Amino acid sequence: MNDLHSEVIVAGIGQTPVGEFWDLSIRNLAARAILDAIKDAGGVKPQAMYIGNMLAPSASKQANLGSLLVEDVGLTGLEGITVEAADASGGAALRAAYLAVLSGRVDAALAVGGEK
């Protein structure tokens, strides 16, 4: 376990355009944003990923996004956790990533919010 961190920063961001992408799945869209965020962060490899989502199990018939997206973007070996908090799911994922870094449990965490 690492020491407590006194400062947590956002090292990179990634976002897909807002729109109706009927030909892309939520996994495709989220993977694009994840890879862009990692690139923007200079290639820093996260040690944990938190995915904020509430509708995928019902709207896209796709549960367990966290573990699936870890594999989709080639980050196998780290935990991928889906966080659900209704309209605040993305914010809850960001908070979980922040607390993971602040606590010293990981040095880098990835927070993702996505709906389709």
Regions inferred by a protein language model and the residue ranges of each:
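Conserved "HGTGT" condensation-loop signature of ketosynthase/thiolase-family condensing enzymes
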Residues: M1-G80, L99-S103, L110-K116
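Active-site nucleophile and cofactor-binding loops and adjacent substrate-binding regions
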Residues: G80-G90
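Conserved phosphate-binding catalytic cores of ATP/NTP-utilizing and phosphoryl-transfer enzymes
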Residues: G91-L99
